[in-house]
C-alpha cells in the first residue's frame, strides 16, 4: 500500500503539470479502456513484451503508455486522453503483482513469456472486478497461481514436465483468444488445469514410490 501511495503522489504531480501545460484532459471511459485492452490482448506490442521482467522499466508504466498510445486507434485524441485514477491504480497493482511474480519465482524464458501474456487480460479483470485484489480465492488469482506454480523451475527435462508446459501454453492461448468480459472463463480454465495438474502430481508420487 505504501508503494502504491508513492506511485500515486508521483503520478498526481505529473498529471497536474501536464494539465497545466495542455489543458484539461478527458479520462478514457471504461468502454474505451476495455476496447483498447482487447486490442493489446490480441496483438501485444513489442515494447510491452520487452518490458515484462525488465528490472529497468516499470511494467505498469509501460502498460499505461501503451494504453494511451493505442487509444488513438479508437479515434481518441492523444493530446487530451488520460487515465481515470482508479484505472491507473488497477494497472499499478497488476503491474506490481506480475513484477513480483516474475522476480521471485524461478521462471525460465518460455515460462516468463507465457506468464507475461496474461498481464493485459488481468488488467481487464481488475477493471471489471476489484475483488481480485482482496479475495485470495478469486478464480483469476487461483488460475494465475496454478500456472505460475506449474512453470516454476520447469525446464521441460522430463516428458511429464513438457506435457505440463504444453498444457500451460494451451490455457494461456485459450484465455488470450477467448476472454472478453466474462469472468466465467477463469473458473472453467482453473478447474480444467487443476485436474491436469493433479494427474501429474499423482503420477509423480507413484513413480517415486516404485523407484529403487
Can you name each region flagged by the protein language model?
Residues 1-207:
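Extended, low-complexity, amphipathic alpha-helical coiled-coil/linker regions that act as scaffolds
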Amino acid at each position: 500500500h505504501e508503494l502504491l501511495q508513492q506511485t500515486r503522489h508521483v503520478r498526481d504531480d505529473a498529471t497536474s503539470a501536464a494539465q497545466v501545460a495542455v489543458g484539461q484532459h478527458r479520462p478514457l471511459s471504461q468502454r474505451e479502456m476495455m476496447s483498447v485492452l482487447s486490442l493489446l490482448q490480441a496483438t501485444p506490442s513489442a515494447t510491452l513484451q520487452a518490458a515484462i521482467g525488465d528490472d529497468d522499466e516499470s511494467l505498469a508504466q509501460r502498460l499505461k503508455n501503451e494504453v494511451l498510445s493505442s487509444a488513438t486507434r479508437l479515434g481518441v485524441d492523444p493530446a487530451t486522453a488520460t487515465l481515470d485514477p482508479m484505472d491507473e491504480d488497477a494497472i499499478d497493482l497488476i503491474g506490481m503483482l506480475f513484477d513480483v511474480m516474475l522476480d521471485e519465482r524461478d521462471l525460465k524464458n518460455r515460462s516468463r513469456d507465457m506468464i507475461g501474456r496474461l498481464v493485459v487480460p488481468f488488467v481487464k479483470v481488475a477493471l471489471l472486478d476489484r475483488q481480485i485484489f482482496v479475495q485470495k480465492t478469486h478464480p483469476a488469482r487461483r488460475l494465475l497461481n496454478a500456472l505460475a506454480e506449474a512453470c516454476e523451475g520447469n525446464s521441460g527435462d522430463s516428458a511429464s514436465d513438457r506435457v505440463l508446459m504444453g498444457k500451460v501454453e494451451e490455457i494461456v492461448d485459450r484465455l488470450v483468444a477467448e476472454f472478453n468480459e466474462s469472468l466465467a472463463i477463469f473458473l472453467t480454465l482453473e478447474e480444467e488445469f487443476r485436474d491436469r495438474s493433479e494427474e501429474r502430481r499423482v503420477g509423480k508420487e507413484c513413480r517415486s514410490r516404485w523407484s529403487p
